[in-house]
Structure formats: structure tokens, C-alpha cells
């Protein structure tokens, strides 16, 4: 079961649904880096796939997102940018479902089913390794047809306004960028994309962010500085 099984109906009800969108890659000429060397660099950055994730699974999944027959060569010709996405993938064949607990691979279109707001919030907590926890998450629709998400974050009750039913609230993602400063956490949420509409959210300290970008040559940003999502409403009315 490959990349698009990440979104299959066999997954848990709150998991993302299938959206077959091809991920773009960096266009500039880059010096190829072998698959194994890339993995070694990621491991030095504490990014390691679940033990059940095999090279064959990764190559199959990358093929399904790129349709590149020479899949390993494709990964090597686009060092780190393609392989980084795989740490945010998910597969029901894996006992722990996630390829890792380091990041989330996502796309705004996955919010098309509103239950994905709950799934995304749960995963945003999971990648912080317990530093930020989301509990009692529920969705509701008010009399004006606006959707809301209610939850507790580190025990603090909150309620975020989303959008009218049928519309996607991209500002929902931006809201998470404010939580680390509000909660005085040691790390912050990160953002990366390689030119496509899909992106990866991670969680890092200042030192980890600098080291990640230096070792991979990628331009991973802080979520609050990335300007890829709308600002949330200034009020909840």
C-alpha cells in the first residue's frame, strides 16, 4: 500500500483522505547526493523512519507522487527535499501508522473533509513530543453555518473560528505558530515546501533549525514567518 494509501478509507476516520497531487521539486541544478547519504544526514538530525518503513516502501511512495521511473535517481537528484517529505507520511500497514513523529506532510485540500482539522491538531501535538498537548477536541457548526473547533491546549480551553461550512480555513494552520510563544515552549513549528502545494510542518529549536538548514541545504522556515497562510480573524464573531 503506497503513498495514496495514506489517504485511503481503510485508515482511521479522522485521517486525511486521498488527494493525488504531484509534489514539485527544486528547479536549480544540484549536486546529487546518494539515497543512503541523505538518510545518514537526516539521522544525524534525529530524523529516522519507523523501523517498519523499508526502502522499497519509500521508493514506491515517491514514485506514486512523482511518476518518475528512476525513483532513486530522482531522490538523489533532488537531495533532501523529496526525502524530507517522507518523514511526514503515513501508512496503515505500519503498526504506529506514521513514518516518523518528526513532522507532518499535508495539503490545504485535505481539510476538504472537516474532520481533518481534528486529525491535524492531534498530529501537531504529537510532533512536539509532549511539549504541546491537545485534548478534548471537538467540532461544531453555529446557527450562521460557521464551523468552530473547541479544544484544550496544555489544559487551557480554546475555541477557534474556522470558515463557513464547505470552505477551507487556511488560517487554521497559521494559528499554531502563535502557540509556542504563548506557552513559552523551547521549540517552534517549522514550515517547508519545495515549490508544490504540499508542505511539511516540523518542530525545532533555534539551534536545530540552523543545523537542519546547514546540513541539508534546504530553506526550512519558521511557521510564523513563512507567510504561506492567511492571518486568522481578528475576532471570533
Region spans (language model):
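Contiguous interface-forming segments/domains that mediate binding rather than catalysis
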Residues: 3-237
Amino acid at each position: 500500500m503506497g503513498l495514496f494509501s495514506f489517504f485511503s478509507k481503510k485508515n482511521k476516520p479522522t485521517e486525511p483522505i486521498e488527494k493525488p497531487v504531484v509534489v514539485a521539486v527544486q528547479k536549480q541544478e544540484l549536486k546529487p547526493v546518494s539515497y543512503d547519504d541523505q538518510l545518514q544526514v537526516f539521522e544525524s538530525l534525529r530524523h529516522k523512519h519507523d523501523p517498519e518503513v523499508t526502502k522499497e516502501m519509500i521508493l514506491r511512495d515517491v514514485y506514486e507522487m512523482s511518476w518518475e521511473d528512476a525513483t532513486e535517481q530522482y531522490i538523489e537528484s533532488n537531495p533532501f527535499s523529496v526525502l524530507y517529505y517522507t518523514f511526514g507520511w503515513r501508512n496503515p500497514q505500519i503498526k504506529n501508522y506514521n513514518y516518523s513523529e518528526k513532522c507532518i506532510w499535508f495539503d490545504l485540500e485535505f481539510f476538504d473533509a472537516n474532520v481533518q482539522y481534528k486529525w491535524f491538531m492531534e498530529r501537531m501535538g504529537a510532533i512536539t513530543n509532549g511539549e504541546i498537548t491537545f485534548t478534548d477536541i471537538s467540532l461544531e457548526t453555529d446557527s450562521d453555518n460557521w464551523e468552530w473547533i473547541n479544544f484544550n491546549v496544555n489544559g487551557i480551553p480554546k475555541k477557534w473560528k474556522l470558515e463557513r461550512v464547505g470552505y477551507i480555513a487556511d488560517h487554521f494552520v497559521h494559528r499554531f505558530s502563535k502557540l509556542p510563544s504563548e506557552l513559552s515552549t523551547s521549540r517552534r513549528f517549522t514550515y517547508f515546501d519545495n515549490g508544490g502545494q504540499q508542505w511539511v510542518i516540523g518542530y525545532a529549536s533555534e539551534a536545530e533549525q540552523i543545523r537542519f538548514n546547514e546540513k541539508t541545504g534546504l530553506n526550512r522556515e519558521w511557521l510564523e514567518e513563512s507567510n504561506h497562510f492567511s492571518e486568522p480573524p481578528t475576532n471570533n464573531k
